[in-house]
Amino acid sequence: TMQYISYQELFPDSDDSTKLSADIKEVFSLFFQNFDYKILGISVDSDEKNASAQLKLTTLDAEALASDFVSASLQEEILETASGKENDNGNSLEQRYLLLYKLLKNNTYSSAERTTSIQLNNLGSSSEPDWEITHSSSLENDLVGGLITYLSDPDLVPPAETLTVYLKTLQEMDVKQMANYLGLDSILNTSDSAKNAIASALMEQFHSCFNYKISSTSVSGYLAEVDAELTTFDSNSILTQYEKELNTYLASADAVIDGSQKRYNKSHELLLDSIRNCLL
């Protein structure tokens, strides 16, 4: 298989051409473990210099594998951003094959059949033939069940499924990851302890409340529009409760006695309580 399929061919846009480790090469063993073929017919030119063989190939469902790979790649990219760490090897050949390995190791894929034509050249003579398979990109693609074509298809994963991967990954993050991904980490790192507590409480509420439901999709050429209902905390309820509690406090004798600094601190305390007591 290695003679006819280049490691780089599966991912021509990868950032490097590093040779793969022995462990990663097991990807091909896993991919071809149920590979099978049937020769349907062979035709030889009259001069016996060229021949064409028609075959039926049985491979795993490369379209399903490619779809899983694209979705998993997007998820990894999102989580990498959420980690707050830069990964210079994110687009490397090694990383991509590691992901393929994980998918093939953990998932079960059904079989798929496709017919193909293989060209052969006779490097010998008619009396002492020496037939050699002609290498081509189409042969590489057919041997892997069309995986190369599927991986290069920008429309392989529909818009609604792409958005689902994004939102589901966001939903499954912990609070710190979510804050990093949404760019709120700087707000949480303020030196003002009261503001930090309020920002943290808001993130906790968002983390616990966030949900989504995709309702419809429309595609026009290269553009797609996906309608989705997003559920988050009720900011109006928080502000209404806060204003009510604050007005009650400001109208009390305690507010006069406390002075400006204590009133300032009390306002933060009331806002924090309103956030923590927020109900959907």
What feature does the model see in each segment?
Residues 1-34, 38, 143-213, 237:
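Core segments of small alpha/beta cavity-forming domains
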Residues 38-47:
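Long amphipathic N-terminal alpha/beta scaffold segment
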Residues 40-41, 104-107, 215:
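Beta-strand-rich interaction surfaces with strong enrichment in secreted/lumenal proteins
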Residues 47-59, 222-232:
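A short hydrophobic beta-strand element
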Residues 58-76, 231-250:
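Short, cysteine-centered beta-strand-loop-beta hairpins and adjacent loop/turn segments enriched
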Residues 64, 73-98, 102-152, 248-280:
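Short beta-strand edge/turn micro-motifs at domain boundaries
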Residues 173-174, 221, 234, 246:
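Charged, low-complexity helical/coil segments in non-catalytic cytosolic or luminal regions
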Residues 209-216, 220, 231-233:
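Extracytoplasmic/luminal low-complexity segments enriched in Pro/Gly and acidic/polar residues
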